[in-house]
């Protein structure tokens, strides 16, 4: 018996093929669904924070990452004029100054 003859005997029924086609969109939807965050990492970005030593005039931009499944606390990341990114400590006066400036503008 040839290999082709064996495979001819294993053809699925039309009902089975139709069932497979019906489940295909569900399988694709489940496998393409990712975590909420686009970076794919479900952990806090700010492992270490800075509480002092940075003046507001050295900050060029801010990024706020709200609390969620990835991290229990909101994170505030400041980009400095030299390109360095730092995480600000939520309990520090600097954090409160930055938030106040954001709310005033």
Swiss-Prot record:
The keyword Phosphoprotein applies. GO terms for biological process: adenylate cyclase-activating G protein-coupled receptor signaling pathway; antimicrobial humoral immune response mediated by antimicrobial peptide; cytokine-mediated signaling pathway; defense response to protozoan; leukocyte chemotaxis; negative regulation of angiogenesis; negative regulation of inflammatory response; negative regulation of megakaryocyte differentiation. Keywords: Chemotaxis, Cytokine, Disulfide bond, Glycoprotein, Heparin-binding, Phosphoprotein, Secreted, Signal. Glycans are attached at residue 31. Disulfide bonds join 44-71, 46-87. Residues 1-29 form the signal peptide. The keyword Disulfide bond applies. One of its GO terms (molecular function) is chemokine activity. CDD domains: Chemokine_CXC (cd00273). Homotetramer. Interacts with TNFAIP6 (via Link domain). Interacts with CCR1. Interacts with CXCR3. Interacts with THBD; this interaction enhances generation of activated protein C. This is Platelet factor 4.
């Amino acid at each position: 018996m040839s290999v082709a003859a064996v495979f001819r005997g294993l053809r699925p029924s039309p009902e089975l093929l139709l069932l497979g086609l019906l489940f295909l969109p569900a399988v694709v939807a489940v496998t393409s669904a990712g975590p909420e965050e686009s970076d794919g990492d479900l952990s806090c970005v700010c492992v270490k924070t800075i509480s002092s030593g940075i003046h507001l005039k050295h900050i060029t931009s801010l990024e706020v990452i709200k609390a969620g499944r990835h991290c229990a606390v909101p994170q505030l990341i400041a980009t400095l004029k030299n390109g360095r990114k730092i995480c600000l400590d939520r309990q520090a006066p600097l954090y409160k100054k930055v938030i106040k400036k954001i709310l005033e503008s």
